[in-house]
Amino acid sequence: MSVKESLSLLNSMQGNVKIGNVEPAKGNEGYVDNAGYVDCTKSYFEATKSLKEEQLVCDPKFTLLDSISAFEIMEPKMDSGIDYQPLRVDFSRDLSYLEILALMDLIVSAEKEWHYGSPLSESLLCSAHVFSICKSPISQVGDSGFSSGSGRNTTDIVLFPFVLAVIKCCDIVHREFLMGNLYDEEDISSFSYHMSFLQNYPIEKLNYLLQSSIEYLASEVIKFSAELRQIIEGILNRIQLRIGILRVYERSDIKTTIDALHLIKNLVPEIQNTVSVVDSSIKESILKQYWDFRVQAQLVATAPVRNIPPTGIEHSYQRILYFADDMLLILNSHTLASSLAVYQFCLDFTRLNRTPEPYVRSSLQALITANNAVNLRDQPTSYMLECIREFSGLPSNFYNPNTRTVIEKNSISSAYGPLVESLIAHSTNIMVDLVRICSHNPCRFRRNLINLLPEITVAHFEAEALDLKFVAKSLPSNGPFSSFIYHVKLNAIEHILLSSFEQKLHQPYQWPHFFAVLDHVFSIHQTHLELHGKDRNTPPMAKTFVTYLHRILNAIKETYSGYLLLTVLCMRLNIIKTPSFTLDEKIQESYYMAHYRPLINLRQPKPLLRSEADCIIKNLQNFSTDDLIIKSNEKFTAAKNSLINVIKSGFEQNEFINPYFLQTNYLKNLLCCCITNLVSLAILSKDHSANLKIVEIPGNPLPSLSRT
């Protein structure tokens, strides 16, 4: 439509324009209705009359690129800009202590929502105090406070440093993305909004302001009644908590970080007890005066609206406790006494019953791979060779465990010297990559594992060839290289499968195929560990560890075997429904290839073809309902007993695994699933039509059969 046609249409509409659900009264320019819409009819038509034919409407701050980007992501600003009225905030007004306390809690809640995936435009930037600092150039952010006057009020002394500290914490997280230590949502970057995160603001000045706030509040608290004193002490605790979080984010040294984390764990329960001091009316008043939920209309570019439900202030502080627990957990990794323990620790870190926030995951990567070393101790090559030595042993004339180096190259036969160098280089990259990607979010972790699988396959071929060379030289015949690389390969396949289930990539009617494939891989891995543990050439300490891994794998395998029977039973009883369109042969083949394509073309382990999986499922379907219930009950009972035995016994060889063994938490969650299923199977054995369904229990890795 041309500009001339547009003007004609606008003129024909004049006098009948309706803004929102309100018919604007003539001469009522600037009227704001209950929904927050502003009557701009008169100004709008005056502006359109000034247009000429073929003239483009543009604004120097809104470029063509911005408009295209906004259109592509369905930017709400395209619709909200014309009716948006910026929030007018009087920053010179001195807030009461109760209002400051409420604002602190709301800002912390918004900060945690950002850490867990909400866009800045729906979380932190909605705070007028945060927004006012972020949109100002760093050169204009001093230390005087929010108000422009010469005098500093309580809000400037107390709330201003707190807000600065929150933004500075976000800046530190933001820098982790810029350095490539994290890969999550793009809009985590403040650059997307052309705003500042106080990148160059001196942290020394910030510490001084926070300390001044504490001294000011300490002098004020003695002046007031017990009720107001409780509020001021609550503010003091929140400032001290922010100092502790800032210390953790700085990563100065391990002792300082651990002390700060213990401070956080002590302060959060006290703060949680004072959250209820602020009633709902105060919160609503604060939100109305200092919170702009439509702030995206002021931003140059924003991420698509996600409308992630707010978690609430109480849960936000619970998330801070999670943060402290997770950080203490990864700091334990520096106490691990062996290279194989580091590898196992990182794998187990991916099995936490919640996804740690981004900074925790980047801290794990920073701690494990800092200074081009693994766990601040081994160079990458020696780390990889130590893993092999601890798992299956290495020939004494090949590797020196005292110096952690390969023997001199001139003593390695020229027949397989290049093969040794190729395998060491290849395997080293794989092991370091595995440690690194364990810190990624679950979706990226799975994708990176799939990308790494071909590299592991090549390394496995090289390891087999090298082991044959050693056999020809009358060296140990248990294949030390190929045994360990094959173990790593099976670990990768298992985590690819398990993470696909955790991310709900399989529909319930596809679960039998999934559990059949997983059971097949577990069986191969179980056999590999069993044979390796019995090999006479495996060192005694390695045998102990491999035997323990075998017991863990056996307990996990029995659990998932029980789920294979359980899903077939649920489909029989119509607890899991099968859509009719999925019965088509081509659709079934397409589903199978989509889920298991990375595994289909592997030579080792031999993949489970769809025809073989169908045969396994069909054999189970031939059982009667009662037989399926009995067999499921037997499997889950065996799994429960195995899990209890492994959890109780633990692993006593601290040379390999430290007392904080993450695997135990995962096994406990599997045990909960087994017990829940056993209770439901007992109900089904008495009444096949019992009202049961598959439910997901928070924290458990698998859904369970339970009452509706």
UniProtKB/Swiss-Prot annotation:
What name is this protein filed under?
N-alpha-acetyltransferase 35, NatC auxiliary subunit
Family under the similarity heading: Belongs to the MAK10 family.
Species per Swiss-Prot/TrEMBL record: Schizosaccharomyces pombe (strain 972 / ATCC 24843)
Q: What are the protein's UniProt keywords?
A: Cytoplasm, Nucleus
Record function comment = Component of the NatC N-terminal acetyltransferase.
Q: Which domain of life is it from?
A: Eukaryota
Choose one Gene Ontology CC annotation of this protein and give it. Answer: cytosol
PANTHER family membership? GLUCOSE REPRESSIBLE PROTEIN MAK10, N-ALPHA-ACETYLTRANSFERASE 35, NATC AUXILIARY SUBUNIT
**Could you tell me the Gene Ontology terms of the biological process aspect for this record?**
protein maturation
Record carries keyword Hydrolase:
no
Q: Which InterPro entries match?
A: Naa35/Mak10
Keyword Nucleus: yes or no? yes
User: Where does the protein principally reside?
Assistant: cytoplasm
Q: Where does it localize? A: Cytoplasm; Nucleus
